[in-house]
Amino acid sequence: MKDYVFAARQRQREMFVPLTHPAGHAQADFGEADAVIAGVEYRAHYFVMTLPHSDSCFVCAYPAATTEAWLDGHNRAFNFFGGVPQSILYDNDKCLVARILRDGSRQRTRAFSGLQSHYLFEDRYGRPGKGNDKGNVEGVVGYARRNFMTPRPRFASWDAFNRHLEEQCCKRQRDVLRGHRESIGERFVRDLELLTALPPTPFDACDKQA
């Protein structure tokens, strides 16, 4: 990823691109797809984080969409992108939101509050039942299922599966999407400039119960 960003910086054109999404912000969600890992059939749950300005994405898979998977997915995504988004848009998943208060604000779960405090990003939420509020990541959830997991993935381990998914995310950086003249990777340069620096250590992705 670092090599690609360096090359994209060198090639970046001076041109005006109408911006639908501000750079430096993200959306996150989970999807599901069938996979065979070490000979065992699973309904894999895959974490997706997107940067809607550039359409850059990160995808990694888990046996279940647990709290630990949410936390680990953030750690991996931030490392992949090389920084922390200014804000991340979510749905109201129970691993993240303990409850929605009367004023519409969210009471975070203890684990998610720890993650947010460690990385210092703003957490934002879509309206309950309104998946189109985070349409960018919803689109990539479907794209990843069709393009990264068809035919049904078969790998010796979850680590091998996730290496494959990361390679696919890197390859996608070369794509030029409809309505754009720059590749995803070229647009990602603007996102990267507005990401905040990673802390010295990643967050401990273990859900500690009181």
PLM feature segments, named:
Residues 104-123:
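Two-metal-ion acidic nuclease core segments, chiefly of the RNase H-like superfamily
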